[in-house]
Amino acid sequence: MAVTTALVKELRERTGAGMMDCKKALTETDGDIELAIENMRKSGAAKAAKKAGNIAAEGAIIIKKNGNVAVLVEVNCQTDFVAKDVSFLAFADKVAEAAIADTVTIEDLQAKFEEARVELVTKIGENINVRRLQYITGENLVEYRHGDRIGVVVAGVADEETLKHVAMHVAASSPEYLTPSDVPADVVAKEQQVQIEIAMNEGKSAEIAEKMVVGRMKKFTGEVSLTGQAFIMEPKKTVGEILKEKNATVTSFVRVEVGEGIERKEEDFAAEVAAQIAAAKAK
C-alpha cells in the first residue's frame, strides 16, 4: 500500500510522533498503520531505555486536593521547554489525579503510568520521570504554586487568606521544620558544636564560647523553622507572632520544588548544540 499524506497525518494524530518518524514507520510496514503503531510502541520502549540515563531535573509540581487530603506530585523532564509542553503537563496532571483518587506509593504510581511514560518519551524525545509524591492532611488545606516549579500546601486553623500568605512565605523561605522545638536534637547538637568551634577560633575561651552559642542557637532554630522565621510580608515580626495576632495555627506544611536533590550536569551552550547535531546525524 502506498504511503500517502493522509496516512502519515492519521498516524501523527494517533501517536503524536513526528512526521518523519511516522513516514518511516509506515514505509517499513507498507502502509499498514496498525502494524506501524505496534512497531512504534516497541521501538518507543527501546528509546525510553536509552533516555533513562539522561538527567531529568526540570518539570512540574502538580497539586490536587480532595476534602481534607492533598497531594503534591513531581514529574520531571530534561528541559524547561518540555516542562511547558501541553502533552507533558497533561501527563503530569493525570498522574496527580490518580494519586489523589486513591492513596498510593510512588512505586505504584510509577508502575501504573509506565506505559504512558514510555509513549511520552517517544513523542517528546526526552527522559520523563514520575519522581515523587507527598500527601498532607488537615482540617483546612490551602495551596500555593510559584509557577510550576514550587508547590506548597499548608494545613491549619485560620482564615484562607492567612494560610495563603503563610504558604507564600514557605515557598519563598523554605523552612525545614514547623517550630524551633521541632528541630531534631542531633541537628541542634551538630550546629552547636560548629558554633562553639567558630567562637573558639575567634579567640574566645571554652566557657565564654558556650555562653555565646546560646544566643546563636536560638537564632539558628528560628531561622530553620516556620514560626521562628521573619515573615516575608512583615519582616519585623516572626510568622509565629503573626499567627498569634490572628489567633491562627499552622499544624503542618509541605513544600516541594522541581529538581531538589538532583545533581545537574553542567554543559556550555556550544557543547549542547554540538551534542544535538551529533544526535541528529546519528538518526
UniProtKB/Swiss-Prot annotation:
UniProtKB keywords: Cytoplasm, Elongation factor, Protein biosynthesis
PROSITE patterns per UniProt: EF_TS_1, EF_TS_2
Gene3D superfamilies: 1.10.286.20, DNA helicase RuvA subunit, C-terminal domain (1.10.8.10), Elongation factor Ts, dimerisation domain (3.30.479.20)
GO CC annotation: cytoplasm
GO MF entries: translation elongation factor activity
InterPro entries assigned: EF-Ts_dimer_sf (IPR036402), Transl_elong_EFTs/EF1B (IPR001816), Transl_elong_EFTs/EF1B_dimer (IPR014039), Transl_elong_Ts_CS (IPR018101), UBA-like_sf (IPR009060)
Location, primary (coarse class): cytoplasm
UniProt region (Involved in Mg(2+) ion dislocation from EF-Tu), positions on chain: 79-82
Localisation per UniProt entry: Cytoplasm
Pfam families: EF_TS
Keyword Magnesium: no
Keyword DNA-binding part of the UniProt annotation: no
Family to which the UniProt record says this protein belongs: Belongs to the EF-Ts family.
Purpose: Associates with the EF-Tu.GDP complex and induces the exchange of GDP to GTP. It remains bound to the aminoacyl-tRNA.EF-Tu.GTP complex up to the GTP hydrolysis stage on the ribosome.
Protein's UniProt name: Elongation factor Ts
Native source organism of the sequence: Pseudoalteromonas translucida (strain TAC 125)
